[in-house]
Swiss-Prot record:
Gene: EPL1
Lineage, opening ranks: Eukaryota, Fungi, Dikarya, Ascomycota, Saccharomycotina
Principal subcellular localisation of the protein: nucleus
Chain coiled-coil ranges: none
GO biological processes: DNA repair; positive regulation of macroautophagy; regulation of transcription by RNA polymerase II
Keywords: Cell cycle, DNA damage, DNA repair, Nucleus, Transcription, Transcription regulation
Low complexity composition-biased segments: 450-463
Gene source species: Candida albicans (strain SC5314 / ATCC MYA-2876) (Yeast)
Gene Ontology cellular-component annotations: NuA4 histone acetyltransferase complex; nucleosome; nucleus; piccolo histone acetyltransferase complex
Chain residue ranges for the region called Disordered: 1-75, 429-490
Function in brief: Component of the NuA4 histone acetyltransferase complex which is involved in transcriptional activation of selected genes principally by acetylation of nucleosomal histone H4 and H2A. The NuA4 complex is also involved in DNA repair. Involved in gene silencing by neighboring heterochromatin, blockage of the silencing spreading along the chromosome, and required for cell cycle progression through G2/M.
Protein name: Enhancer of polycomb-like protein 1
């Protein structure tokens, strides 16, 4: 497969441009932009006529060794490698052989033998044991591996070299440790890992305490200062639960593996502490603590390390990678071949404060989750250690019982057989579980008590008020019961204080639920019917809309209009009903009764309309009469377009339709003005209307004209009528005085309740 080749050149100018520029990419390949992939069968077969002149000349030229100038290879498909690597000998031979085979050249018959030499990995290397001593594979206990990017968490950074190995064998292993007591831990010789641990501690400590040691290597800290600082740091790291330690400079450093194991071992009270990160858990020798190592091998290792440190002029003993020096010249960094990990200039992504906040929250939540997981793991470890101790104690008890049983048999002692069998363990009830159970029962009782109080309160509200005749009162002024009864504190009911706002809120919610329930039942009752009545839900109130300018809102109004012929009938007549009207078929499931005597009208086409017409329900030519007339005349255009208005419009002054379209404007001192849309021209206020011989106006005429113009902005030629929706009392024709009396009585009844 290969990337998409550039388009072929159509003329000579484009061919030259293709030779010079199209072969090399103008910009870097971006992973965000898709690249077309071609397979070998998708590539065109190029003949010598289709190739460019430079390519044909290159393929036909004899590759002689005496030629001083080697032509550049121009291929139909890019090689995909860098420009400098394209000059590699084996790559050029393979590409040229492939192109000659493509053109059908028979001169080179061994073109198939050309290949790029690569190491053969299909064979067994017999000399591998000389370089790799670890030949045996050991199955790990778990497949979980630690993917750390910092070497501090998996081992020691310091590695022994030839000088260290010579000192370790000739000096450290022969003369140390000095035998002071017979303890196995003190008599054990120093291992290579322990030697590397001591050197690593010395390297990191001197780097933190004396960062500018290379200026004067002889002024190095003494052994007493370094050892005391390292031991104190180790003890403080073991005591705390923080995996980081704070240096003198304020930097955070991760604790070493030895200190981490020591701390975890003391926390769970189990030794030795072996992790899955070790190579072989069964044979790994435990590294002794740092204080013990410095006590046994600190002085000789320090002398050896100090000598090497001074020899290196204060720099690190271990070879390190060389990075770019920001203070040096850029050309020096580019020409230095030992600099690794060179910087690449990338455009930094812009970060917002919101992104930083989200990232911090995620890191904080992840830290909490890790702390929670660590606590769970430590709890499980402690539980398993206790189980192990319990099993060991039971095993020791079992062996003691067996020995005692054998002794009883030898001495022929009988009785006390129950002592040799394990008893049934009693269930241990923890105090925490008991307290948790008590809290749960108390919470349940409190919920039941609150529910009972709420039910009693609702029953009191639903009970009707008692009539005044039943009130216990006497004319002589005596009463059967005392108005105030003093109860002891133990018998006073513990009830919450009920406020007036809470009672009114519950009452309003009860009324709202009752109204919604009635509306739901009415909706279920009217399901499957087409409502053509004047006003099924609101009280009847005839509103004349003949003079309305905009009729699109009438079918969706809260009060239905009585003049149906003024708006489109398709809003409430579906296609099925239109089809029945056109075919003169009776409506299915519809029965019509006469309004005068209740007689059933025979089933025929539109009996309900005919009965209404015979009864002369309306004297004027209304909607039903027009509908019957259109059925008789076979004119069904009114179903879609509506009936024309036959009532002449009054020529009175126009009345503004409600709602009005106005604009809200805030003036000086926070005053609010409502501006109407100026649809009519303003009169000319500047016309001189002063009469001859009249009294001259001493006030400024310009101010008066401005006031008239401002007043005209808020005026309109329509007569604004007060909408009935702003005063609900007008729906039933109630006068304002009667409405005020009704409102006062309503407030009085509410206060009594």
């Amino acid at each position: 497969m290969a990337a998409a080749p550039p388009p072929p050149a159509k003329n000579q100018g484009k061919a030259k441009q293709h030779v010079t520029g199209a072969r090399f990419r103008q910009r870097k390949i971006s992973v965000k932009q898709p690249l077309t992939i071609y397979k070998q069968r998708d590539l065109p077969t190029l003949d010598s006529n289709e190739l460019e002149p430079s390519q044909v000349h290159h393929l036909n030229s004899n590759a002689s060794s005496s030629s001083t100038q080697q032509p550049r290879d121009l291929h139909a498909v890019e090689t995909g490698v860098d420009k400098n690597e394209e000059e590699e000998v084996h790559l050029q031979q393979v590409i040229n052989a492939a192109q000659k085979a493509l053109l059908g050249s028979k001169k080179e018959e061994k073109s198939s033998d050309m290949y790029i030499p690569t190491p053969d990995a299909s064979r067994i290397w017999p000399e591998a044991h000389k370089y790799y001593k670890d030949q045996k594979f050991k199955q790990p206990e778990t497949y979980i591996k630690f993917s750390a990017t910092v070497e501090d968490t998996v081992g020691v950074e310091y590695n022994m070299d030839e000088v260290d190995e010579k000192f370790y064998r000739e000096t450290l292993c022969k003369y140390y440790p000095k035998k002071k007591n017979k303890s196995d831990e003190n008599n054990r010789k120093c291992t290579e890992l322990e030697f590397e641990t001591i050197c690593d501690k010395l390297e990191k400590t001197i780097e933190a305490r004396q960062p500018f040691l290379s200026m004067d290597p002889s002024n190095i800290l003494s052994y007493e200062e370094l050892s005391s600082y390292i031991v104190d740091q180790f003890k403080s790291a073991v005591k705390t639960s923080n995996p980081y330690i704070v240096t003198n400079g304020g930097n955070l450093e991760y604790i070493s593996t030895t200190a981490l194991k020591e701390r975890l071992s003391k926390e769970i009270k189990y030794e030795p502490f072996v992790t899955i990160f070790d190579k072989n858990q069964m044979s790994t020798s435990a590294v002794r603590p740092i204080p013990k190592l410095f006590e046994l091998f600190g002085r000789p290792v320090y002398d050896h390390w100090k000598e090497r440190k001074i020899e290196r002029k204060g720099k690190t003993i271990q070879p390190t990678l060389k990075f770019e020096d920001p203070n040096s010249n850029e050309k020096e960094n580019d020409n230095d071949p030992y600099i690794c990990f060179r910087r690449r200039e990338f455009r930094q992504a812009r970060k917002t404060r919101r992104a930083d906040t989200i990232g911090a929250e995620r890191i904080r939540s992840m830290q909490k989750s890790l702390h929670r997981a660590r606590d769970l793991i430590m709890s499980v470890s402690e539980r398993e250690i206790l189980k192990l101790d319990n099993f060991q104690a039971e095993h020791e008890l079992f062996k003691a019982r067996c020995a005692t049983k054998a002794c009883k048999r030898e001495l022929n002692i009988k009785g006390d057989e129950y002592l040799f069998f394990p008893h049934k363990k009693k269930k241990i009830v923890r105090t925490e579980d008991e307290e948790r159970e008590k809290k749960r029962e108390k919470k349940k009782q409190d919920q039941e008590l609150a529910l009972k109080q709420q039910q009693a309160l609702q029953q009191q509200q639903q009970q009707p008020p008692q009539p005044p005749q039943q009130a216990p009162s006497k004319q002589d002024g005596t009463s059967t019961s005392q108005p105030y009864v003093k109860l002891p504190p133990a018998k006073v009911p513990d009830m919450d204080l009920v406020t007036v706002s809470l009672v009114l809120k519950e009452k309003n919610e009860t009324i709202k639920r009752a109204v919604l329930e009635k509306l739901r039942k009415r909706k279920e009752h009217d399901k499957g019917f087409i409502n053509l009545t004047d006003d099924p839900y609101q009280p009847f109130f005839d509103i004349s809309t003949n003079r309305a300018e905009e009729l699109s809102h009438i079918p969706y109004s809260s009060i239905a209009a009585t003049h149906y012929h003024q708006f489109n009938t398709s809003n409430y007549m579906n296609d099925q009903l239109k089809k029945l009207l056109e075919e003169k078929k009776p409506l299915p499931g519809v029965k019509t009764f006469l309004g005068s005597n209740g007689e059933l009208v025979p089933s025929k086409a539109f009996p309900h309309l005919s009965s209404l017409l015979e009864e002369k329900y309306k004297a004027t030519s209304g909607y039903i009469e027009r509908l019957l007339q259109s059925v008789e005349t076979q004119d069904f255009s009114s179903y879609t377009n509506g009936f024309k208005d036959v009532e002449p419009k009054e020529t009175n002054e126009p009345v503004m339709a409600f709602p009005q379209r106005i604009r809200r404007r805030v003036g000086r001192a926070g005053r609010v003005f409502l501006d109407h849309q100026q649809e009519y021209p303003q009169p000319n206020f500047q016309q001189d209307t002063d009469r001859v011989g009249g009294i001259p106006d001493v006030y400024c005429k310009e101010d008066a004209i401005k006031r008239l113009q401002s007043k005209w902005k808020f005026d309109t030629e329509y007569k604004t009528t007060e909408p009935f929706s702003l005063d609900p009392s007008k729906l039933n024709g109630i006068s304002p005085s009667t409405q005020s009396i009704r409102f006062g009585s309503m407030l009085l009844n509410r206060t009594r309740k």
